[in-house]
Regions:
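N-terminal membrane-targeting hydrophobic helices
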Residues: 1-156
Length: 156
């Protein structure tokens, strides 16, 4: 029954929030079913022992969104439909109350434990690496670094 709840309400929320009557709502439905389908396939093939796993993670959904944004051509129908798919996946995570279970919604940051806010041991390394990568790309050369040190602004 939760699948009907998430699919139906995903369509309603999309139309209410975005007011796009021309969107292909099948991609919203498929996106709202994708986390369940993906995790069921992983469970069926024995890749996990949980029926709610990586497909229910916000990082997985955000990663899909970024991949669609980077890999598709702006203004194309494929991109529009891919974004609808991503929106449907986001709606599923909200409407299925996945956000109530931190070990699932924030996988792999949080591990299964009794402590409500027990972070995985390597989160500082991952976050630090992300920060280093960002700064590396922002400070492409010494001139940009000097300008930032002097003014606090980036040269684009």
């Amino acid at each position: 029954m939760i699948l009907f709840w998430t699919s139906g309400l995903s369509i309603y929320l999309f139309l209410y929030i975005f007011k796009d009557k021309n969107a292909d709502l099948r991609f919203i439905i498929f996106g709202s079913l994708f986390p369940v389908i993906f995790d069921s396939i992983l469970y069926f093939f024995g890749l996990t022992n949980q029926n709610e796993y990586i497909g229910h993670s916000i990082f997985f959904t955000v990663s899909l969104f970024f991949i669609f944004m980077i890999a598709t051509k702006r203004g194309s129908l494929f991109r529009a439909n891919s974004l609808l798919f991503s929106i449907g996946s986001f709606f599923y995570l909200v409407l299925s109350f996945t956000w109530l279970n931190q070990s699932i919604i924030l996988y792999p940051l949080f591990q299964n434990s009794e402590d409500i806010f027990s972070l995985a041991k390597n989160y500082k390394t991952v976050l630090g690496g992300a920060g280093i990568l960002y700064l590396f790309f922002k400070f492409r050369n010494i001139q940009i670094l000097k300008e930032f040190i002097n003014t606090g602004k980036f040269i684009y």
